[in-house]
Amino acid sequence: MMKEKVIFLVDMQSFYASVEKAENPHLKNRPVIVSGDPEKRGGVVLAACPLAKQKGVVNASRLWEAQEKCPEAVVLRPRMQRYIDVSLQITAILEEYTDLVEPYSIDEQFMDITGSQKLFGTPMEIAKSIQGRIMREIGVYARVGIGPNKALAKIACDNFAKKNKNGIFTLTKENMKTEMWPLPVGSMFGVGSRMKHHLNRMGISTIGGLAAFPLDLLKKKWGINGHVLWMTANGIDYSPVSTSSLDGQKAIGHGMTLPRDYEHFDKEIKVVLLELSEEVCRRSRNAGVMGQTVSVSCRGADFDWPTGFNRQVKLAEPTNSTQDVYEAVRRLFLTFWDGKPVRRLGVNLSQLSSDDIWQLNLFQDYAKKMSLGYVMDGIKNRFGDTAIIRAASLTAAGQAFERAAKIGGHYK
């Protein structure tokens, strides 16, 4: 009989804010908020330390709301590169316990410690050791969810380890019926707000209710996604802890929320679509791939009454040429846009293949067009993202300069 796996989900408490407090001792006893743009009160709270959360501050809320609840809070601009560096330091610590470490996000990592127990002790002993190492060396408090698979480890961390005194909780096939099944279905790993709403309308309010729901009905309604939801609710997850989670990438995309409502295509929207197309194609070229399916997404400015679309088109041949992708994006957008103000745009390139060879085209100098993109990439990689830039990005609608100062949409 195969030995049951032991999987950890290690999560850093209020990661961005905790890093700032660890590196600035004078902030130790003060509430700290990390916000995307502290100069703009409409900015979003990216992280709030426990002292700020005690005053009612929550992540993803507007900064002005957070400051009303906690006016004494110290508001800091994020340092994304520093957080990435610290995250890598934490990964290095975890890799001393096992070589099976999978970053799930910048502040969460899965570990498979099944084969590590003879060296480092019981799962509880290993979890406590990891907590101590990270606190001593990084100054950040880690919580650990333990389970026989990734799904249960994640649920154990999110719903129990984050709330109990020692920051460690084990969820098993034996105790999940008493511990996990009574939880609201919205607290289950993989269930977002929209899915929660759909499940509630079907009479499913708890994880246990989802576990007991007829599988065939879930599959009929949501296909494979319905099957995965049912499996998770029943504590089933066969996905391994993978050290190469980026292998086999299916698509390359980029999106952004605009700083204001964009209403005019020629003066505003097309500038951002061109910038997004260029970013996607640059990343594709750096990855050595081309794509044959182009998609564009748009979200309207009214968040109370969501509008928008997500449409795609298959090209005649794979490409990573900015102009090819932009032309497809432009046609798609103009076909499906309802003319209303836009607040978010996205461009995606999928059905990827290697760029080693490409279909010869008798009517275009394809090699010349593709080489141009690689030359521009070389200049940017050597001298910076803004070393060479399109004239359209210099207009009021352009976002290229602003994005160049950020990582993942936030300041470096």
Curated annotation (Swiss-Prot):
Its EC number is 2.7.7.7. Keywords: Cytoplasm, DNA damage, DNA repair, DNA replication, DNA-binding, DNA-directed DNA polymerase, Magnesium, Metal-binding, Mutator protein, Nucleotidyltransferase, Transferase. Mg(2+) binds at D11, D107. It holds the Pfam family IMS_HHH_1. Its main location: cytoplasm. Gene3D superfamilies: 3.30.70.270, 3.40.1170.60, 5' to 3' exonuclease, C-terminal subdomain, DNA polymerase, Y-family, little finger domain. Disruption phenotype: No visible phenotype in the absence of DNA damage; in the presence of H(2)O(2) or methyl methanesulfonate (MMS) cells grow poorly on solid medium. A double polY2-rarA deletion is less sensitive to both H(2)O(2) and MMS. The keyword DNA damage applies. The record marks Y16 as: Substrate discrimination. Binds 2 magnesium ions per subunit. PROSITE patterns: UMUC (PS50173). The active site is at E108. GO terms for cellular component: cytoplasm. It catalyses: DNA(n) + a 2'-deoxyribonucleoside 5'-triphosphate = DNA(n+1) + diphosphate. One of its GO terms (molecular function) is DNA-directed DNA polymerase activity. It is an enzyme of class 2 (transferase). Monomer. Belongs to the DNA polymerase type-Y family. This is DNA polymerase IV 2. It comes from Bacillus subtilis (strain 168).
